[in-house]
Each structure stands twice: as C-alpha cells, then as structure tokens.
From Swiss-Prot:
Gene3D superfamilies: 1.10.287.1490, Ncd80 complex, Nuf2 subunit (1.10.418.60)
Ranges in a coiled coil: 136-233, 293-332
Main location: nucleus
Keyword presence, Cell cycle: yes
Keyword 4Fe-4S: no
GO cellular component term of the entry, any: nucleus
GO biological process, one term: cell division
Similarity comment text for this entry: Belongs to the NUF2 family.
Entry's localization field: Nucleus; Chromosome, Centromere, Kinetochore
Name used for this protein in its record: Probable kinetochore protein NUF2
Disulfide bonds: none
UniProt xrefs under PANTHER family: KINETOCHORE PROTEIN NUF2 (PTHR21650:SF2), MEMBRALIN/KINETOCHORE PROTEIN NUF2 (PTHR21650)
Organism: Encephalitozoon cuniculi (strain GB-M1) (Microsporidian parasite)
Amino acid sequence: MQKRNVYAVPDLPVKEIMQYFSEMEINIKASDILKPTPQSTQRIYEVLLEVYCGVKTSDLLPRINSGESIEAFEESLSCILLQKRMSGFLKRIGIDNFGLRDLVPDSRRLIGILSVVVNFSMFRDNKRHVYERVCQMNDEKLLLKNEIDEKVHNAKKELERCERDARKSIEEAKGVEEEISLLESELKDFYRHQRALVQETERSKTERNEYSDKLSSLKLMVLNLNQEITCLKTQIVSDPTKLMELLDEMRCLIAKESEIMKGLEVKRVGLKEKIEFMQVLKEDTMKAITLAISNREADKTIDKTNREISELEVQMKNLDSGINALKIRLNHVSRQISHIESKIFNLQDNDKRCSEEISAKLEKLKSNYGVVSDERNSIRGKIEENVRLTKSIEYELVKRRNEHANDITAIQSALCRLKDDVFNYFAEAKGIIDKTMSD
C-alpha cells in the first residue's frame, strides 16, 4: 500500500480564513463559507486554482454554441475538470481524498480544505526565500552542468577529429613508407642489374683484349709465312725430288694455314658478334647511366618524401601532444564533474537529512497533536460544561431578576397604594381638622 502524505491541520476560524484571503485580495464572504451553495463552492475552487496553480477552469473547456444538452454536457465536463485539477492541487499539499462529493456544499468540509490551503500558503510564504534560493542554486548547477557537458562534447568532437586526422596521417605515412620501400626494392634490383652489366662488360673487355692479342700474333705469323713463301719462291731448286717434297710440305703448310685461317675467320666472326653484343651492352650501360641520373632525381624525390614524412611525424607528435592536452583537459573536466556530482550528492544528503528531520518533527508534532487534541477535547468538554453551567446560571439569574423585578413592581405598587392611602388619610385628617377649626 502506498504511504499517504497526510498531516492533520486544525480547522481555522472563519474570521482568520477571511482575513488571510482578504490580504491576498481574494474575495470570499463569510456566507460563502458558513452557508455555501454549489455556485459559491465552485467559484471558491476556481479562484484557488487560478491563484495557486495559474489555471483558469474557463480556459480548459472550449465553448460549443449548440442546444441545452451541449450546455449540460459542458457544465458536467467543467465540474469533472475542476475536480481533477483541484484534486491534483490538494494532493500536493496533503489532501488526497478530494472527490466529486466535495463539490456539494458542506460548510465543515469547506472550512477544513480552506484551513489546509491557508496553512500551506502561510508555510510557502515563510519558506519562499529558501525555495527561491534553492531554485536559483539548482538553475546555476544546471547551467554549469550544461556548460560542462557542452565543453566535454566539443572536446570529444575535437578529440575525434584529431584522432581521425592522426589515423589519416598514419595511413598516409604507411602508404608513403610502402611506396618508399617499393622504390628502394626497385632501386636495389636496378643496382644489382647494373652491377651484373658492369661485370659482364669488364669480362667482355678482357675477352676482347685476349682475342685482339691472339689476332695480332696470328697476323704476325701470317706475315712471317708470307715472307718465308716469298723467300722460297726466290730460291732455286736444283733437285726436283726436293722440290716435290718442298711443294708437298708447302701444300701441307698451306692446308694448315687455311685451317688456321678458317679458325681465325670463325673467331673473327665470333669477335665481331662479341663486339656487337658489347655495343648493345654499351648502349644498355648508357641507358643505365641515364637511369642512374634519373635515380638521383628519384633520390631527391625520396629525400623530399622523407622530409615530408619527418614533417608528418612532427605534426603527429603535435597532434599527440594536443590529444594529450585534450585528455588532460577532459580529465580536469571529469574531475570537475565528479566534484559537482559530489556536491550534488552532499546537497541531496543534506536535503534527505533535512527531510528526515522535518519528518521526525512532523511525527513528533503528530504525537504532540494527539496529546494536545486529547487535552483540547477535555478542555472543550469542560468549556461545554462551563457553558451549560453558565447558561443555567444565566437562566437562574434571569429568573431571579424577573422575580426581583416582579417583587419590586409589587412593592412599588404597594407603596403607591400606601402612598395613596396616606395621602387620602392626611386629606381626610386635614378635612376633619379644617372642619373642626371652622366649628
């Protein structure tokens, strides 16, 4: 079962209720409280809602220009809306049993409700400065919290942007590094190929020199043989057999020389092919030299790329330092938020403690109210007894006063009769005396 927030408020005198509402410029007559009607009761509730809640019941229901049934419907709906609004208002100040039956005129119930409203209004007026100060502090805290949240949000955005830039820079640096590594591998392959070409060129030069030396020696041998042939041609041969042997020997030598010449021709063709190949190698070498020159430009580009990488690394370091600064700032803001949250927690604890103290005081007041209520009932009983005694005494006093007045009246009438009798007696005596004196 839900705990009801109800505290007992004694009924205030009608005079005090009217005086308080007149100070608030609320026109409520004594007859509206002591002898309420449905119209006066509804008007009082509408005035209370307008003053304390800022709600006009006439604004809650749009008017429909139609027949009597629509007017009756609007009246019923306005009564229901008035009961709902008034029930919500009274629940907040401690009365949670306000229903449609309370719209029926009842002087005692109306005095009780107005007493609770006056008590709440007086308490609100007394604690208004505390409420306004707490509201101001709460608004300042909310404003500070919103500013801190906005700063944290902006810092997070800046941090995310820096992280994106850093990731982009890292990716670009990785791409540049991959391109540099690819260029380095291509350059190494090119250097290796150039080194192989240089070695092949040196070996071809060595072979060419060797073949040139062999060709020179062979040319010298041919020249010597030609000289010998010339010498032999000039010699005179006396013996034909020797001449035939010499011819055979010369034929053999010529055949050998022919074979040697064929071998030399083959070698010459091979050397010519070697020379052509060396020319091709020379052209390739020149191309390689041109490529080496272009490699220098590539080296310059690589150096420029390395410098850009260094600049990017410096920018990354700056971004890292900025990120660290933002993290420090974020930590500082987090500490401030924690400090504010701790303050809010302390304020909540203080509020809770104050609420507990107020609840304890209210419980104590409730218990004291029971004792005071008993004493008040006993005193009221004594007062009623005294009133009864006073009324009986007043009745006896009036009765005795009437009896005394009757006795006084009887005495006065008796005295008047006695006076008349004495006057008559003295008149008769005077007449007798006068008569006697005349005789």
